[in-house]
Amino acid sequence: MTGNAPDLPAFAALARAHDALLYVDDAHGFGVIGDRDGYEPGPFGRSGNAIVRYFGESYDHVVLTAGFSKAYSSLLAFVACPTPLKRYLKTMVPSYIYSGPVPVASLATALLGLEVNRRRGDDLRAQLWHRTRTLLDQLDKLGVATSNTSGFPLVELALANAEDLDAVGRHLFDRGIYVTLAPYPVVPRREAGFRVQLTAANTAEQSTIS
């Protein structure tokens, strides 16, 4: 819930050293962060092809799962993994074998989202970084602590009294601000609070604290 990425290269190196598989759930990173090769327009990288490429890693000994529900607003998910493992999963994993086809509407939404990503995704990612940076800088000036040190667009704010969480959520919602509540056991007891998720569609005014 912190909005920070783990030290993926260290975990990947450990997995390869012991011939193990590293399972990575990149629910929020897919579509937002990606390749960094010196040509990207902003700190989030380019292409939005997820955290493995963001850190310049390969899929050797790595299994990545990600979904389209965050960046693409579509009911779709996928697994990226080494080819031999892919063959095994397609024939041996019940959750895949007994699953049905993707709803056509969800598939159409995902395809259109990928086209938007191809055409102007890097510009949207750069804009998202600026919106996030604006919010984080203002919180810092106000002395409001957040665990976000990466600059990624997930900003978690802890409350001094966890019992106020629901009331705070309602207070913000009534004022047109939707946040995700993070109670225990989703987070440790002392870190209960809420999470602000910014998008490229947020305006400069919406990411400014007034």
Language-model regions: role of each:
Residues 35-88:
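Active-site PLP attachment segment
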Residues 63, 75-76, 93-102:
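A short glycine-threonine-serine/GTX helix/turn-capping micro-motif
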Residues 29:
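Residues immediately C-terminal
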Residues 41, 47-48, 135, 175, ...:
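Membrane-embedded alpha-helical bundles of multi-pass transporters/translocases
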Residues 1-19, 34, 163-166, 205:
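Active-site core of PLP-dependent enzymes with the aminotransferase class I/II
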Residues 122-136, 140-176, 186, 190-194, ...:
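Conserved PLP-binding catalytic core of the aspartate aminotransferase-like
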Residues 65-66, 99-100, 145-150:
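Short beta-strand
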